[in-house]
Design a protein with these regions (language model features):
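N-terminal mitochondrial targeting presequences
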Residues: 18, 33-44
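Short, conserved acidic/polar surface loops in the N-terminal third of protein domains
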Residues: 142-144, 169-176, 200-203, 217-220
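Basic polycationic patches enriched in arginine
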Residues: 3, 27-29, 34
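Membrane helical hairpin/interfacial module
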Residues: 126, 132-163
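A gly/proline- and charged-residue-enriched helix-loop-helix capping module
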Residues: 155-189, 194
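N-terminal chloroplast transit peptides
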Residues: 1-25
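Active-site environment of non-heme Fe oxygenases that use a 2-His-1-carboxylate facial triad
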Residues: 43-111, 116-118, 122-125, 183-191, ...
Length: 439
């Protein structure tokens, strides 16, 4: 998406011979175009892949996000749950405690298959299940046997329409993706978030460790239901009444506009914005609103792309419980700047990573107070659990109840993730867990 929209803008600019742009600006645009082409991966194919005479069909798209009905009297609902509810998060299954040898992969797969409904019910009740000590999941084929034995239904990465997350085995249409293992991102603390892009969100995910980092690199999880309960009622009320929206992309490469005659700057900005908007909205399956700003990168002019307004709390589609479904911890530029003081700069150094910089606002585009941002950060971090995974360990999580993230690390880290559109027996689980008497 980014490469297409940016190059379209530059192509349009090059045809505007009425505007005088100095050679430095032209070189800057050309350099960025080459950089973006080099650093932006080609989206994965949606055609079947033929490998060793076996046709691999691509998984289906991630399902549409289930926003549900509005929650009336959100603060009253919070107080009722706070008075009556105590969550256990996560559930844990230790292979050794089952009486199964760590290297007996056949017995491990048999256990997973025979207890699939119980494990999936734990995922729904507890929000996440941590499985430890299973040799079965130490490699990709075994990991795929694991989630197939559970009856999980794989889907494409929700980023599919806008970029390409690398796959673990490097093959197109592979269902197991890299989980942000790049050495260049080791100083980047990945804030807590639910996985969704635009209109699509997986129902569940399984994160697996194929190789643990020498230092750090813990997988982070937090219970969205507990975050909802722990929020200050006034902050909760403000957020829910005004909704939220994300800035999902920034194009900070338009300094050259300052070198255009003043009378032509506004018309040129209109042309750029119109071309970029048309290109981006033709690529993604959600509406993107572009707006001009300054100061994102060393005072540079930028185009900021904002997604539609959405609620920060939703009712869980299976159990009906209210849960925090908001990525402020990972998307807020202010919170990321605060973390830079602890972990160092995020290293937004190249074209692709700069474009991927994000932020969050109220749904009416108002700025969120620093005090409210820091309160949300404190509540989130209070609920974060650092899961140090060893080879073969898996965290099976419900994407609506469980937020996830990743700690900084040193060394070589090889974690993978599979996304799921649903699972076998979902309606049966829903009938046993959903209560019409929920507040």
């Amino acid at each position: 998406m980014v490469r297409f929209s940016t190059l379209a803008v530059f192509a349009a600019l090059s045809s505007c011979s009425a505007f005088t742009i100095n050679n430095h600006a032209i070189r800057q645009r050309a350099q960025f175009a080459r950089l973006n082409m080099a650093t932006t991966a080609t989206p994965p194919s949606t055609k079947p892949l033929i490998d060793d005479d076996v046709v691999h069909e691509p998984p289906p798209l991630a399902p549409l996000t289930i926003w549900g009905d509005d929650i009336e009297n959100i603060v009253d609902i919070q107080q009722k749950y706070k008075a009556t509810t105590k969550y256990t998060f996560p559930a844990t299954i230790e292979c050794g405690e089952l009486g199964i040898a760590s290297d007996d992969e056949d017995a491990q797969l048999a256990y997973i298959t025979e207890n699939a409904m119980a494990i999936k019910t734990k995922m729904q009740e507890n929000g996440a299940v941590v499985l430890r000590g299973f040799d079965l999941m130490k490699n990709q084929p075994g990991f795929q046997k694991f989630y197939s034995g559970l009856g999980m239904k794989v889907c494409l990465d929700p980023l599919h329409s806008v970029s390409a997350r690398p796959t673990v085995d490097g093959k197109a249409n592979s269902p197991v993706y890299e989980a942000v293992n790049k050495e260049s991102r080791k100083n980047f603390f990945i804030g807590m978030h639910n996985e969704f892009v635009g209109t699509r969100a997986p129902r569940a995910a399984a994160f697996v460790c194929f190789k643990a980092a020498e230092t750090g690199g813990e997988f982070l999880i937090a219970d969205g239901r507990q975050i909802f309960l722990d929020l200050n009622p006034d902050v909760l009320d403000r957020l829910y009444k005004r909704n939220i929206r994300y800035s999902v992309m920034e194009l900070p490469f338009f300094d050259f506009i300052d070198n255009v005659p003043e009378f032509a700057q506004e018309p040129l900005k209109g042309v750029i914005k119109g071309l970029a908007s048309a290109a981006i909205n033709a690529k993604v399956d959600f509406s993107v609103d572009l707006r001009w700003g300054e100061g994102g990168y060393d005072g540079a002019r930028m185009l900021q792309a904002r997604a539609p307004s959405q609620p920060p709390i939703v009712r869980h589609p299976v159990t009906g419980e209210p849960t925090w479904f908001c990525n402020v911890h990972s998307h807020s530029s202010q919170l990321r700047k605060d973390r830079e003081e602890i972990y160092g700069a995020e290293r937004f150094e190249d074209g692709a990573s700069q474009i991927n910089k994000s932020d969050m606002f109220y749904g009416d585009d108002g700025s969120i107070d620093d005090a409210d941002l820091r309160h949300m950060d404190e509540v989130t971090m209070k609920n974060v659990q650092f899961i140090k995974m060893s080879e073969g360990d898996v965290v099976l999580l419900d994407n609506y109840k469980c937020l996830h993230g990743r700690n900084v690390f040193d060394g070589t880290r090889k974690h993978g993730v599979a996304w799921f559109e649903g699972w076998e027996g979902e309606e049966e689980i829903k009938s046993s867990l959903y209560s019409e008497a929920l507040p």
